Amino acid sequence: MKFGAQTEYGRLRKVLMHRPTEENRRITPGNKDAYLFRDVVYWKEFQREHDVFSDLLRDEGIEVVMLTDLLDEDQAGIAETLPNMVYTRDVCMVSRLGAHSLRMTYAARQVEPFLVEKAMEKLGVPIAQRITPPALVEGGDFVWLNEETVMMGFITRSNEAGVNMVRERLMGGGAVKEFVAVPLPSFRVHLDGAVMAMSPDIALFHEASLGLYPAYVYDGEGVRLQYLRDYLEGKGLEIIEGNDTEVRMFGTNIIGLGDYKCVSYEWNERIIGILDDRGFDVLTIPGSQLSIGGGGPHCMTCPILRE
């Protein structure tokens, strides 16, 4: 089968998701931090909001593959006990080389890559890489600038060993020509919460998250230091600033569908307006419960194929 998703804005053809069931009933005020949730959620509304999102993607002609449909009964039963499994982005990244099976930082998510790897094998996507200790890599730290360039955040969830493993595989395998490693401050969980390439010439950007430390830009000539904003502007991108409140509420965590169409949470009104002025068609979904888990539309999708 065809696979590979090396942009954020190419036509999205196939995506892996996980429909939440009653696993979120496990979350209590006492264990919510261990489960990486901001608070308890009402599981039926959480599920309903997710259904709205997945139905929207199907209505746009995107093939939505649900994780549990690819697992055996025992594996599916385990998946339905994992509150964070809904954020499939973090568990796997699919490049033109195949699926990169990642390694999660916290105990609440450690088994997720095993399940997603089984799903990728069932789909016929080759496993291009398995992240192994001491490396840690979470998929929310990948943001593709274009087909030849990927940005990867590290420090908070992914680590330096993970950066090196992924960089060596992608660059060594000829999948990318430039690899930009972006150090994140302690308050920023993943890179996709602070920057998003909306098109070849427009990016959402949060200066408070990304302006503290220079990034490492690797290319065929070696490595150089450059602040990410300067790097993006040097590539000719227009920067649209997200403010602290918007970023807290996943205002930059948008999933592109292709042809200047994308999906955002419905309350992201200012950024939606700016994108609308630039010719984007921004589709919206509710997320009063989904966002409590700590993710947005980008987080809940693991692209398998873009064109």
Q: What is the predicted function of each stretch?
A:
Residues M1-E307:
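The feature marks the mature, well-folded catalytic cores of soluble enzymes
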